[in-house]
């Protein structure tokens, strides 16, 4: 678990700039509020495909954290495999050192 990333995620949540869970992430992406989306290493294949589609559709960068859902639970008090940050500063800090996941928009016929 990366304690630096956990700290950033926790601060983001306390600032009210974090969407937790698939439904909230999709809503924030659709509204244009999401600056970046982050997934855990143990997200299901179905959820991974769904979040890739959402990020491709709304042109939001997607990153994979070196964290599990249990690590996320430790930092947030809520078990989640996908989060979105609605603040550019927090998103940039959390994405530092991570490579965005490449998404081919043609894969989804968007």
Indicate residue ranges for each PLM-predicted region.
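Conserved catalytic alpha/beta core of Sir2/sirtuin-type deacylases, generalized to analogous enzyme cores
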Residues: 1-3, 15, 103-106
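N-terminal first-folded block
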Residues: 4-39
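Solvent-exposed alpha-helical segments within well-ordered globular domains of core cellular machineries
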Residues: 7, 23, 27-30, 49-53, ...
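Short, ordered loop/turn segments at secondary-structure junctions
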Residues: 23, 42-43, 67-70, 88
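N-terminal positively charged helical leader segments and presequences
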Residues: 30, 34-52, 59-61
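Mid-chain, well-packed structural core segment of small domains
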Residues: 54-83
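C-terminal structural segments of small proteins and small subunits
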Residues: 73-110
């Amino acid at each position: 678990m990366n304690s630096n990333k956990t700290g950033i995620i926790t601060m983001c949540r306390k600032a009210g700039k974090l969407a937790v869970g698939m439904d909230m992430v999709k809503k924030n992406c659709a509204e244009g509020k999401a600056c970046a989306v982050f997934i855990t290493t143990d997200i299901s294949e179905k959820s991974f495909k769904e979040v890739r589609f959402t990020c491709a559709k709304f042109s939001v960068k997607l990153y994979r954290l070196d964290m599990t859902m249990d690590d996320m639970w430790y930092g947030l008090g809520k078990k989640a495999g996908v989060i979105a940050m609605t603040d550019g500063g927090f998103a940039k800090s959390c994405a530092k050192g991570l490579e965005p996941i490449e998404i081919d928009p043609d894969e989804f016929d968007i």
